[in-house]
């Protein structure tokens, strides 16, 4: 079974978020997603300062099996991108919850962030969505 840390929130699109500050979240792909994708060979991410809309595509991940869209779990402004993925996209496979993170999103309205997080899945609920 895939690794599903209990301290994260999850989307139906197999992305995780971790609150790093009151107004900022870190976003990445789940262990299930990376194992389903196979070897990741390229990750396309937006520039710092780009505006994201929850539920809308913000980039792509290309693997030996397919190209998949990445979807924003929250609305906000990209405050950091993982530039290590440019030269080492395989970090998404080897360390999806650590060095393989994708981007940080700053949300100016903390109340809106609280509401957005409340709509995401906890670890147990996410685990229940996975096909065995």
UniProtKB/Swiss-Prot annotation:
Gene3D superfamilies per UniProt: 2.40.50.100
One annotated GO biological process: glycine decarboxylation via glycine cleavage system
PROSITE patterns reported in the protein's UniProt record: BIOTINYL_LIPOYL, LIPOYL
A Pfam family hit: GCV_H
Function description: The glycine cleavage system catalyzes the degradation of glycine. The H protein shuttles the methylamine group of glycine from the P protein to the T protein.
Assembly notes: The glycine cleavage system is composed of four proteins: P, T, L and H.
This protein's name: Glycine cleavage system H protein
Organism from which the protein derives: Mycobacterium leprae (strain TN)
């Amino acid at each position: 079974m895939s690794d599903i840390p209990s301290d994260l929130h999850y989307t139906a699109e197999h992305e995780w978020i971790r609150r790093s500050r009151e107004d900022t979240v870190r976003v990445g792909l789940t262990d299930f997603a990376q194992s389903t994708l196979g070897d990741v060979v390229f990750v396309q991410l937006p520039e710092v300062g780009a505006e994201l809309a929850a539920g809308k595509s913000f980039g792509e991940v290309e693997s030996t099996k397919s190209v998949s869209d990445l979807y924003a779990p929250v609305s906000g402004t990209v405050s950091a991108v993982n530039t290590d993925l440019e030269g080492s996209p395989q970090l998404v496979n080897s360390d999806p919850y650590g060095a393989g993170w994708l981007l940080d999103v700053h949300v100016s309205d903390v109340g809106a962030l609280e509401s957005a997080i409340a709509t995401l899945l906890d670890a147990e609920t996410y685990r229940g969505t996975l096909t065995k």
